[in-house]
A protein has these predicted regions:
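Extended catalytic cores of very large enzyme megasubunits
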Residues: 1-186
């Protein structure tokens, strides 16, 4: 932290309490500073306030009473904003979305498009959930006469993508693969 601030102070249209920094241990404060603070923020209370004001704003109108309550709840550690909200909400970096859901078509073009989409989604700050239920299982004939290797080898490619593309500056990408319970590869 750059300077020691104490007491209650107005910030972004609400009142924050710098004394609540004491509720966080050193590891938490260091992690917040390293990954979640935005430009001129020096304290966790400022990041909590930014996220609270962002979450209480709809179509350009901010409900400051709601923002104050959200700030109080997060600064008292009763709940915490998701990573994309705390790191990106109210800023110009990344997206304030926790999870994107996408569909994996059963074609080479569809798989290629899925990989490309994942690169952009992961680097924008959100986790990804991909539906693989339409991808043919291992050993099924393709229209070109070969046999499918199933969805699992293609999921390994997605895993490598998540290792390679970070969610902004906060963490590596995350991905959850979904399929139907009656899919032959389950």
């Amino acid at each position: 932290m750059i300077e020691d601030k104490v007491g209650k102070k107005p910030y972004l249209g609400i009142v924050i309490d710098y004394n609540k920094e004491k509720k966080l241990d050193k590891f938490s404060l260091d992690t917040l500073q390293d990954r979640y603070f935005w430009e001129n923020e020096t304290h966790a209370q400022e990041a909590f306030a930014r996220a609270a004001v962002f979450a209480a704003t709809y179509k350009g109108e901010t409900d400051f009473e709601l923002a104050q309550r959200l700030y109080e709840y997060s600064s008292d550690l009763w709940f915490m904003f998701s990573t994309p909200i705390l790191s990106n909400g109210g800023t110009t970096r990344g997206l304030p979305i926790s999870c994107f859901l996408n569909y994996v078509p059963d074609s080479r073009r569809g798989l290629s498009d899925h990989y490309d989409e994942n690169i952009w989604l992961a680097s924008s700050g959100g986790g990804i959930g991909g539906y693989w239920g339409e991808v043919r299982s291992n050993g099924v004939a393709t229209r070109h006469g070969s046999r499918s290797t199933g969805s699992i080898p293609f999921m390994h490619v997605v895993d490598a993508e998540m290792l390679a593309f970070n969610q902004g500056t906060t963490r590596r990408g995350s991905y959850a693969a979904y399929s139907d319970i009656d899919h032959p590869e389950i």
